[in-house]
Amino acid sequence: MKVIDQYVSDRVSLYNGDSIEILKGLPDHCIHYAIFSPPFSSLYTYSNSDRDLGNSTGDDQFYQHFLFLVKELARVIMPGRLVSVHCMDIPKMKSRDGVIGLKDFPGELIREFENAGFIYHSRVVVWKDPLVEATRTKALGLMHKQLCKDSAMCRMGLPDYVLTFRLPGDNPEPVSHEAGLSRFYGEDEPKGIKGARPEPDADLVAKKEKYNTEPVYSHQVWRRYASPVWMDIRQSNTLNRTAARDEKDERHICPLQLDLIARCLELWTNPNDIILDPFAGIGSVPVVALQMGRRTMGFELKESYFKQAVLNCQKEENHDDSNI
């Protein structure tokens, strides 16, 4: 396995290096689930490494290189198990693309995974505040003054998406929730009866009146998780990324929301499953995996992010959340 540096303990393995090369060193079908946020083509610059997918010369080169990663994922994921990808539509910029518009990044990713043999399993929209986007990006299409001037150029804000793909085959280790869902990840937790619903009142049944009017907690949680739009992901609930910024960074990273990670792990993994993030950044996925009793593996090319990921995982292993 070609790595620059590594941190390995009983439940976590972190590697500083090229994710595609590291994946080649893993045995077949050894990963239960993968979740990650890939470089968004050349939208962000993460490092000056030639191996960084974010430094592709254009979209065609990015997708050509990304397919190598997807093919390796198809080899290491267990049959019947899943890979989830966080993504969004990519803005077209007049200075770079010649026009103002959007690129269908999620659609391209779906085609990449299907070309590698995966089955397109699901998509969920993660709501984001358009005012926050407008303030951060100054996008013309979100400006109120543009609405007043010529609303033909106005657009909606850009949500996040979580695309999930399934590797064909029978799942040898079913993901079971025999007692339903007993916890909730997100804001505004639903209310309801936890555990078995009590027996109905015989008198009310005889009178044909309502009984068991209080909802079951697991049903309410599943209703929220099964929604095609997740309105309840806390956008600010992320790992502290301050320590991972270099002076040479052109743009800082935006770590994945912890609620989103936890929700996916709750739905699609068992305790002690091995969770992979091939673009681990500062360790958001490994940290949540450890918190939820999973084993985890993460790859990160950039040294400063890798070192911060190690610190974050060590703090979680030592139950010290002072920097999270």
Report residues per predicted region.
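Core catalytic lobe of class I
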Residues: 1-308
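Class I S-adenosyl-L-methionine-dependent methyltransferase module
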Residues: 108-109, 310-324
